[in-house]
């Protein structure tokens, strides 16, 4: 049953779907009240079934955590998201959005009317400014969003796994001044985030746990699912 005071977060990865239910203290600190996760392990040859399996995992989590009718804020895996950092000249704030749209047209590898995109301005460094562009194909986001909604949830904020991880780190360690490297090893990709003095840089590498499983399957001439269980 929906509770307007709780915050539901959903993380949709390639082989794992996780959900957390949070509450806020009087000082706006977040407390994790409940958490559950489901594996979505598929042979790469059955990729067409992934969205259906993700939906089944979401349905299980909704029931287990009793969040039917809640608003879910969710993140999508870095592999499906395009991220680019762009440098901007010193401009009035009124000109920034127009310039960033121009930069998005140059850098995003799809027509802008086919993607959902947004940007965030990073702290200024001298006269130069920098922004991070984030984009995902609209059809991919719509398919995932529809799947989530079909399992007794409505959707709220959407983020990508890379920036979600960075934001979680900054919120958890607000006084940290030393440079840090965050590494998230997923099934299909590995995300690297370098953070220093309020600025961050990201790189997503197309290498993850699924490649290890596939190599084991080939080496021992067994099925992908058997290799995954080893």
Language-model features and meaning:
Residues 42-46, 142-165, 197-230:
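Glycine-rich phosphate-binding loop plus the immediately following alpha-helix
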Residues 58-71, 222:
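Phosphate/pyrophosphate-binding loops at sites that engage ATP/ADP/AMP, CoA/4′-phosphopantetheine
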Residues 19, 29, 46-47, 76, ...:
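Switch/connector loops and helix/strand junctions flanking conserved nucleotide-binding motifs
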Residues 1-38, 72-75, 171-212, 216:
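Gly/Thr-rich phosphate-binding beta-strand-loop-beta motif of the actin/hexokinase/Hsp70
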Residues 33-64:
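N-terminal phosphate-binding loop and adjacent alpha-helix
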Residues 71, 75-171:
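Active-site neighborhood for divalent-cation/phosphate handling
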